[in-house]
Amino acid sequence: MKKFFILLALCAFGTVSALAQQAKYVFYFIGDGMGLNQVNVTELYLASLEGRIGIEHLEFADFPYSTFATSYASNTDVTDSAAAGTALATGHKTKSGMLGMTADSVAVNSIAYWAKQSGKKVGICTNVIIDDATPAAFYAHQTNRGHYHPIGMQMAESGYDYFAGSDFRRPVENGVDLHTVCADHGYTWAYGYDEARAKWQSAEKLIMVQRKDRPRDIPYTIDRTEQDLTMSQIVETGINMLMKNNKNGFFFMVEGGAIDHACHGRDAMTTIKDVIDFNESIKLAIDFYKKHPKETLIVVTADHETGGIVPGNGPYHLNLDLLQHQTCSTDAVTEKLNNLKRNRMRKTWDDIKAVLSESYGLFTKVKLSESEENTLHEAYEAAFEGDAKEENWYSTNSALAAKARDLLNRKAGISWASGSHSGGYVPVFTIGVGAEKYHGRLNNIDIPEITAKIAGYKK
């Protein structure tokens, strides 16, 4: 009998211990396109601003546990964001272009759904469109990531507690307005951070997007104004919403989607600025973790690498500090040049040089050789006399802006493999309850499975 009670007590202790180790609050950060080198280049750049060789640490890169993961899709070595997002959301490989489904088109639920079914509040946010591939992988089931309106319908039907990002890509189709559909499903719309601050306490469920007097798409960090949403504002509002009247905990997916867009454009400084902005939002999760250290898990990873960025292009030294002279994205430079071109009066080379100096620091803070200036002048003639352009997945840029960008990158010591995704490893950084469970080389489908187990979600 005595042995029986001892055994019973040990079982009870084991059960309590297991429960105590569950993560009540889960932050799931995904830097879209943020491979190992995007992190490394950012840290090298920050150190260069201090005039030293080495790295200046990003907070998430100093988490006590770190490893890396593969990102291939079921049908391609180099994945797209839909297949990679589905892997990180559901623990299943699928074909590129598919969302929330296996490769044979069977719908599968996500870790966000498991969390909701387990009584947790759920937040899904990004700094790109809220129906883009990565966020959509956590609530939608579609054979094609381009089915934007059906994806938006499934977002409204998900019942998740908080969404944020840029507004829908295709809000109205066949007379059905997704804004109305979401409102009918109990969501309060907040246009901008100030409006969200005024509404979140009374809202049952909240969707936060850009202010109505600002462009739909949240700008790159380098182009942002004080009226635009920041990643930190998105995360702060999310924490407030998810903690409100909640004793059961939450699952909060945060995507830094603009990193991927900048890498598609092979725009090093714009990429770095968005990695830094991503890090700033993670600091809020770290502050939360410090208040709830025995109940919180933070996972920071990526869906894939974009661009094949490398710190080094031949010489054994870098000049990354030159990048600080870039003041806007290549997309924004293109808009400046297009505005000049719309003015029918012929613009002189000196007019163009002024734009390139203001935008990239070229000619003034970044000295150019005669041959380098000649290369830009040839691009100027091709762009202004003709219509030379460079296209990537998300934008079409002036060939002159692209050439100036490439020149600054090269002088800084940055090289790119392409303007598309690569099959490179992605980082995994963890801190908090169960963080030690992420070890060894991982497959991306392992990450949601490990996370769900640590959090005790019911599938």
Q: Where are the regions a protein language model picked out?
A:
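Sec/Tat signal peptide C-region and signal peptidase I cleavage site
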Residues: 15-20
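Structural beta-sheet core signal
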Residues: 28-29, 124, 300
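A post-motif C-terminal structural segment
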Residues: 24-25, 34-40, 44-86, 135-459
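Extracytoplasmic mature domains of secreted/periplasmic and thylakoid-lumen proteins
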Residues: 85-86, 92-160, 167
